[in-house]
Amino acid sequence: MIGAMAWILDLDGVVWRGDQPIAGSAEAIARLRASGEDVGFVTNFSYSPVETVEAKLAGFGIEARGAVSTSAQAAAGLLEPGERALLVAGPGVRQALEQRGVEVVADGDADAVVVGWHPEFTYDRMAAAMRAVGHGARLVATNDDATLPTPDGALPGGGAILASIERATGVTAVVAGKPYPPSVAALWARYGREGTMVGDRPDTDGRFAVALGYRWALVLSGVATSAEVDPPPDVVAPTLADLVAAYGP
């Protein structure tokens, strides 16, 4: 048994794959909660508003209101209320910024440029970001994931968009999502210093677990297909359901 005060779950590859739930995930989460464990969800996918993520989980029979943490929220936390942000990202980032009290602008001078994955990213948006950074705006990113997993294979992720802006501006962004310090601080504030991080991507979830000081539980239902990864996991299971059955309460 893993004696953890909190179980933090990545979503894609752990709870669902694309638009389909991974078998047994809802039941595993229900078992954890019935045993008094605190379950939270953390995702680097910044495009969708939190309510959309919560609704998707609810559609799979998983109650998640108030339990979802996104890289959009972490990025918004790097700005102060009243600041101006030039948005190069999706509606989830806009919502997080506006809830923070940040003014979102489409062009012109800004205190920060906030970059996240967006399927309609264009040269014009890159140029607007470049101009704003050239005029002194900070460069903030939700995440630097190079790829985005889809049922049809990997596609360019938010990190690919970010790389183009970093190259154009010569500025390295402050990255907010997993496994970087802003998300670490947010998770510590919410769940404390003891827990288990469950994920399928060693480069983000594994490194995040190490940064948090949490146990690193790797499931092989997503990106990783072997336990031979870096950082090495504390425990490995085929799915979340198998993990909870073997190591849970």
Q: How should these model regions be labeled?
A:
Residues 1-27, 31-37, 46-69, 73-249:
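Asp-based, Mg2+/Mn2+-dependent phosphohydrolase catalytic module
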